[in-house]
Amino acid sequence: MDTILALKVIIMGIVEGLTEFLPISSTGHLILAGSLLEFTGPKVKVFEIAIQTGAMLAVVWEYRVKIAAVLGGLFTERRAQKFAVNIVVAFLPAALLGLVFAGAIKEKLFAPVPVAIAFIVGGFVILWVERRNKQQVHAERVQSVDEMTLLDAFKVGCAQAFALIPGTSRSGASIIGGMMFGLSRKAATEFSFFLAIPTLMGATVYSVYKDRALLSMADIPLFGLGGLAAFFSAFLCVRWLLRYISTHDFTFFAYYRIGFGLFVLLSAHYGWVVWAE
């Protein structure tokens, strides 16, 4: 691996880690970053999905005590069983739809312009949900992930399925969806973190297996370096986001999405930036 390639891999890993758990779309930012860096192609699309494992492991480490308690109580504690079932139920909608539409989505929508449109639409959805929740005094029905019902989990899972569209944001769809359905900001954010574990792992395993013919043993250092960069940047981001949501809403991210999406569309139209496909 030459120095330039290593730098590109590290940058992509950092972008993944910083954006995976914010409601701004990691996939969208990876597509745009890869386009700017001229780091594109079929193998890179697998790389972009695989390095999500690094970000996922950051959540595992941050919530290792909770995860260990759930795993330890799977066969003995009703609370742990309920939580595990909720995660599985929330995971299924995106997993099933992903199996059906992943190929078409990767072929048609993994490009800067569709991503920019999804950025803008998602930004307006966040603004609408934040305004709606402020107007409804009793909007927050669920204060903790342990209070969620099976129906709550299924609704969040259906919301997460919209994130199959690049630029939508997996965390944004699940968090904002959770808030729409009565979860507090903290409960929605934490459930989104936990839901990321099977979702990102499943996406990685599926993508690597499906496109295994494109890969070789020589790619392991590249994937490992990107995953490591994603782990450390995601760990810092998760810690920061948990502090941020205690005193802020997601309005800033909505305006960021809209502004950045408009910039990408205008730059593509007027040729300010050459976005590689």
Swiss-Prot record:
NCBIfam families named in the record: PRK00281.1-2, PRK00281.1-4, undec_PP_bacA
Gene this chain is encoded by: uppP
Transmembrane segments: 85-105, 109-129, 188-208, 218-238, 256-276
Superkingdom of the organism of origin: Bacteria
Catalyzed reactions: di-trans,octa-cis-undecaprenyl diphosphate + H2O = di-trans,octa-cis-undecaprenyl phosphate + phosphate + H(+)
Note: Bacitracin is thought to be involved in the inhibition of peptidoglycan synthesis by sequestering undecaprenyl diphosphate, thereby reducing the pool of lipid carrier available.
EC id: 3.6.1.27
Gene Ontology CC terms, in alphabetical order: plasma membrane
Coiled-coil spans in chain: none
Protein's cellular compartments: Cell inner membrane
GO biological process, one term: cell wall organization
Keywords assigned by UniProt, alphabetized: Antibiotic resistance, Cell inner membrane, Cell membrane, Cell shape, Cell wall biogenesis/degradation, Hydrolase, Membrane, Peptidoglycan synthesis, Transmembrane, Transmembrane helix
Similarity-based family: Belongs to the UppP family.
Keyword Transmembrane helix belongs to the record: yes
Membrane topology, as annotated: Multi-pass membrane protein
Protein's name in the database: Undecaprenyl-diphosphatase
GO MF, one annotated term: undecaprenyl-diphosphatase activity
Keyword Acyltransferase attached: no
